[in-house]
Design a protein with these regions (language model features):
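Acidic-leaning, charged glycine-interspersed low-complexity segments
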Residues: 23, 38-42, 89-147
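Oligomerization/assembly interface segments of phage tail-like spikes and tubes
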Residues: 57-74, 135-148
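Generic alpha-helical propensity signal that fires on short helical segments
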Residues: 63, 83-85, 158-162
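Extracellular/virion structural assembly segments
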Residues: 1-9, 56-58, 67-108
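Charged, low-complexity C-terminal accessory regions
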Residues: 48-50, 132-163
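Small/polar-rich, solvent-exposed N-terminal microdomains that initiate assembly or binding
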Residues: 1-58, 107
Length: 163
């Protein structure tokens, strides 16, 4: 059975192997101290766990994933620096989000870092965001749902049998 830890591990491996992602974090987004992250941590892939649906034969894990970067405000003339940096940030982080989705969607190939038993539900809607901390972060968030086998096997449950 593919566990919650396994799915988080796939995301972490994708972040580690991707040439443009510099760090991976998971947990509740409101618990992150963005101000403690350094410039070398960006681009960040962040996975916030959502609900899990336990169904007959299928377990569905839901995550909101964020791909975020600091805005480069050194590009362009003064009135346009932030706008140009934001557009570039949106473009680059959306491409990275598509790469993450491709790893899950094409997990049946031998080149994916995701187990072939994991099925990503499509379509996925991505939403742009910009947040101001000590720096200006921009990127995309998307809620993903991944289905895995759920054996629902009472024989292997660590419970005393009703005899």
């Amino acid at each position: 059975m593919i566990s919650f830890r396994n799915v988080v591990g796939y995301l972490e491996t994708i972040a580690d192997k991707h040439y443009e992602i510099n760090s991976f974090h998971s947990g509740m987004m409101d618990e992150v101290d963005i101000n403690k992250l350094g410039a070398t941590d960006y681009v960040i892939l962040y996975a916030e766990p959502g609900n899990v649906v336990i169904n007959q034969g299928v377990l569905t894990y839901n995550f909101t994933i964020f791909v975020m970067d600091m805005i480069n405000d050194e590009v362009g003339d003064e009135p346009n620096k932030q706008r140009i940096g934001r557009v570039d940030g949106y473009s680059e982080t959306l491409n990275i989000l598509q790469d993450v989705v491709a790893e899950f969607k094409h997990s049946l190939t031998t080149q994916s870092w995701v187990d072939g038993e994991v099925v990503l539900q499509l379509p996925i809607t991505a939403e742009p965001f910009t947040a101001r901390f000590n720096n200006l972060l921009t990127g995309w968030s998307a809620t993903i749902s991944v289905d895995v086998n759920n054996k629902n096997n009472l024989c292997i449950a660590p419970i005393n049998a009703n005899t």
